[in-house]
Design a protein with these regions (language model features):
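Conserved nucleotide-binding/hydrolysis micro-motifs of P-loop NTPases
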Residues: 19, 31, 81-82, 105-108, ...
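Canonical P-loop GTPase G-domain recognition
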Residues: 125, 135-195
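Conserved nucleotide-binding/hydrolysis modules and their immediate coupling elements
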Residues: 209-314, 324-326, 490, 499-549, ...
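P-loop NTPase switch module centered on the Walker A-proximal segment
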Residues: 1-102, 106, 146, 215-218
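Long insertion/accessory domains within large nucleic-acid-processing enzymes
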Residues: 262, 267-270, 403, 449, ...
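A short, contiguous, amphipathic alpha-helix enriched in charged residues
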Residues: 321-344, 559, 563
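Interdomain boundary/hinge elements
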Residues: 41-44, 154-168, 200-211, 240, ...
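Charge-rich, low-aromatic oligomerization/scaffolding segments with amphipathic character
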Residues: 139, 291-294, 368-384, 421-422, ...
Length: 607
C-alpha cells in the first residue's frame, strides 16, 4: 500500500546563472546547523569544482541534505546551463517539488525556461524565491508578474500557478513571506518547503526499486550510483538485480556493498534506507544512469527520460607539434584515451569514439561550453593534446534529407547595438522570432539559429556589444539544413620559421593584422601568431633580427613600439580556429597552428 513519508522532503533548486541559488543553499546549510560555529566555510560550498567557482556556474548537479524540525530536506542543485541539460532532466525525477530562485532586479531569465519547462511537464509544485531583495534597484512586484507570465507561457496548471512567493537575501541569510515583513532568518523558507512540497510516497512493503539518476566517481570505491528509493527498502548485503528501461534484456545480479545517505555536505554510511530516501550506492562496477536496482523476485525497471543526444563534436588529437611533450605530463594517445574514457563515468551527455587515425578521438557533447569545460579540466590535470574546430552532428530524416541541430538564442543587448547583432545573426542563418524592450535601455531578441551558426560567434558578440550583451542558448530540436554559412572573414598570420619572436620581426608583422604573441615567445613554423586583416593566410617571419652595419646600432630597435598582443582565452581560441587549424592545449600554453605545418605541403593541398 502506498504511504507518504512525512519526515522527508526532496527538492531541486532551479535558477539562472548568477541569481544566487548556490549562496542560498549555503545559508540553508548554515542555519540548519550543518557547520560548527567556528568552522571556516568556503563561499558557495556547492560549487566544488574549480571551474565552477571561477566561472560562477554550476555544471554538475550536487546533493546535500539539511534537517529542520525533524524533517530531512534533500536539496539538489541543478545546472542552470542548457549545455548541461542532460543533468537536469534526470535530477527532476528524484524530487517532489522545485524552488525557483529569481533575481529581484533581473527578473525571470530565459535560461530558466529550459529547466522550468521540464519541471512543468513533470507536474512538480513550485516555490518562487525572489532573491537579492536587498539590491537598491530591486523591483519585486514587476518580477512576480514576469514569473507568473513565464509559468503561463510554459503551460503551468492552476495548482502550479497558485504557488507561494518567498522574498530573500541569501547573502545576508534572511527571508520573509511578505516584502513588508521583518527579515530575521531563513525560517520562512524552511516552513514553506515543509508546508507546500509534498512528502515522497511509495510502498515500503513492495519489491525494491531504485532508479539511478546521477553517477559520482571516487578513486577509492569507483563508481557510485545516486538515486531515490521509489518502493520497498534497500539494505547493505541485499541481493539485487540491475535492469534498464531502454534495454530490458540487460539484467545483472549484484550485491549492495555500501549504502550512504546525504547529511549536510557529507555522505554518511547507513545500513538500510526506505521509500523517499536519496541514497548513494557503491560496489557495482558498471552501474550507469537510467539503471533500476530491483528485488530479484520481480525486477521491473522504472521508465526515465532518455539522455539528450550530443549536438556538436571535436577531434581530440595527440600533440605532434615541434614543442610536443615539453610542457605536459600526459602526452601519449593511451593517456588521452584513458582520460576521455574516465570522463564517461560521470558525464552521460558525452560520447567518445575512435577514428581511423590511432592518435585521434572524436568527442561529442551538448555544446561548446560543455566541451571547453572538459578541455580546461584536462589541461589543469597536466594533459597535453590538440583539438580541432567544433562541428555539428547532422541527422538524416526518413527521406534522406539532411537535418541539423537548431538552438534558440535569447539575447539582451543595449538598444544601440541591436542592428549589428541582428545583421550578424541573419548572415549566420538566424531567424528573428521576437523582439521587445527589456529594462535599463536593453532590447530582448529571440533567434532560432542553426547550432553551427553560433560556433565562433560569442567572441564577435562581445566585441559588437562592447561586452554589454548577454546571450543564452537552448537546444531546439532538428530542422532541415539551412545552407552554407561563411565563417571567419579574416585569414591567419603564420610563423615562417621556428625560433623566438623578436621586436623587429613583430613590428613589421603587426602592420598586417592583429598579433596573438609578444616579443620573446617561442614559435614554430606553421604556428598561427595572429589574424590577418585580409582574407588570405600569410607567412611572416617574426624571428627576423635587424642586420647590423657600422652605421646603425642595434639599440635603435628599442624605439620600435609594439601594440600589445591580443591574448586569446580557451573559448576565444576554440571560436577562432578554422577547419584547417588545430588548437594546441598544454598546461601552460594555448597555441593555434595549421594542421599541415610544412608550407610547401600546405600550398599543394590547397591547390
Amino acid at each position: 500500500m502506498k504511504t507518504k513519508r512525512e519526515d522527508v522532503r526532496n527538492i531541486a533548486i532551479i535558477a539562472h546563472v548568477d541569481h544566487g541559488k548556490t549562496t542560498l543553499v549555503d545559508e540553508l546549510l548554515k542555519q540548519s546547523g550543518v557547520f560548527r560555529e567556528n568552522q571556516e566555510i568556503a563561499e558557495r560550498v556547492m560549487d566544488s569544482n574549480d571551474i565552477e567557482r571561477e566561472r560562477g556556474i554550476t555544471i554538475l548537479s550536487k546533493n546535500t541534505a539539511v534537517t529542520y524540525n525533524g524533517v530531512k530536506i534533500n536539496i539538489i542543485d541543478t545546472p542552470g546551463h542548457a549545455d548541461f541539460g542532460g543533468e537536469v532532466e534526470r535530477v527532476l525525477k528524484m524530487v517532489n517539488g522545485v524552488i525557483l530562485v529569481v533575481d529581484a532586479f533581473e527578473g525571470a531569465m530565459p535560461q530558466t525556461k529550459f529547466v522550468l519547462r521540464k519541471a512543468m511537464e513533470l507536474k512538480l509544485p513550485v516555490i518562487v524565491c525572489i532573491n537579492k531583495i536587498d539590491r537598491p534597484e530591486a523591483r519585486a512586484e514587476e518580477v512576480i508578474d514576469e514569473v507568473l507570465e513565464l509559468l503561463i507561457d510554459l503551460g503551468a496548471s492552476d495548482e502550479q500557478l497558485d504557488c507561494p512567493f518567498v522574498y530573500a537575501s541569501a547573502k545576508n541569510g534572511v527571508a520573509a513571506l511578505e516584502i513588508s515583513d521583518e527579515m530575521k532568518d531563513m525560517k520562512p523558507l524552511f516552513e514553506t518547503i515543509l508546508d507546500y512540497i509534498p512528502a515522497p510516497e511509495g510502498d515500503p512493503e513492495a519489491p525494491t526499486q531504485v532508479l539511478i539518476s546521477t553517477i559520482d566517481y571516487n578513486e577509492y570505491v569507483g563508481r557510485i550510483g545516486v538515486g531515490k528509493v521509489d518502493n520497498g527498502t534497500i539494505a547493505v548485503n541485499q541481493d539485487m538485480v540491475v535492469v534498464n528501461h531502454h534495454d530490458p534484456d540487460k539484467q545483472k545480479k549484484v550485491k549492495i556493498s555500501k549504502l550512504y545517505e546525504f547529511d549536510g555536505l557529507q555522505k554518511v554510511e547507513v545500513k538500510e534506507a526506505s521509500i523517499g530516501a536519496i541514497v548513494a550506492i557503491s560496489g557495482i562496477s558498471d552501474i550507469s544512469i537510467g539503471d533500476t536496482l530491483c528485488s530479484p523476485e520481480n525486477p521491473t525497471p522504472i521508465p526515465f527520460q532518455k539522455i539528450s543526444e550530443p549536438t556538436i563534436s571535436m577531434d581530440f588529437v595527440v600533440n605532434d607539434s615541434p614543442f610536443a611533450g615539453q610542457e605536459g605530463k600526459y602526452v601519449t594517445s593511451r593517456h588521452l584515451r584513458d582520460r576521455l574514457m574516465r570522463e564517461l563515468n560521470t558525464d552521460v551527455s558525452l560520447r567518445v569514439e575512435d577514428t581511423e587515425n590511432m592518435d585521434a578521438f572524436k568527442v561529442s557533447g551538448r555544446g561548446e561550453l560543455h566541451l571547453s569545460v572538459l578541455i580546461e579540466n584536462m589541461r589543469r590535470e597536466g594533459y597535453e593534446f590538440a583539438v580541432s574546430k567544433a562541428e555539428v552532428l547532422y541527422h538524416k530524416d526518413e527521406n534522406g534529407k539532411l537535418l541539423e541541430p537548431m538552438e534558440i538564442a535569447y539575447i539582451d543587448v543595449p538598444d544601440e547595438y541591436t542592428g549589428v547583432v541582428i545583421d550578424k545573426l541573419s548572415q549566420r542563418k538566424g531567424e528573428l522570432q521576437t523582439m521587445g524592450a527589456a529594462n535599463g535601455g536593453y532590447t530582448r531578441l529571440e533567434f532560432r539559429i542553426p547550432s553551427r551558426g553560433l560556433i565562433g560567434y560569442r567572441g564577435d558578440f562581445l566585441t559588437d556589444t562592447k561586452g554589454n550583451g548577454i546571450m543564452n542558448t537552448a537546444f531546439d530540436g532538428y530542422a532541415p539544413y539551412k545552407g552554407d554559412i561563411q565563417y571567419r572573414k579574416q585569414g591567419s598570420l603564420i610563423a615562417y620559421e621556428t625560433g623566438e619572436s623578436v621586436t623587429y620581426g613583430l613590428y613589421s608583422a603587426q602592420e598586417r593584422g592583429t598579433l596573438f604573441i609578444g616579443a620573446g615567445e617561442k614559435v614554430y613554423s606553421g604556428m598561427v601568431i595572429g589574424e590577418n586583416a585580409k582574407t588570405d593566410d600569410i607567412e611572416v617571419n617574426v624571428c627576423k633580427t635587424k642586420h647590423l652595419t657600422n652605421t646603425r646600432s642595434s639599440s635603435a630597435d628599442d624605439a620600435l613600439r609594439l601594440t600589445p598582443p591580443t591574448v586569446l582565452s580557451l573559448e576565444q581560441a576554440i571560436d577562432f580556429i578554422d577547419t584547417d587549424e588545430l588548437l594546441e592545449v598544454t598546461p601552460e600554453s594555448l597555441r593555434i597552428r595549421k594542421k599541415i605545418l610544412d608550407p610547401k605541403m600546405r600550398k599543394r593541398v590547397n591547390r
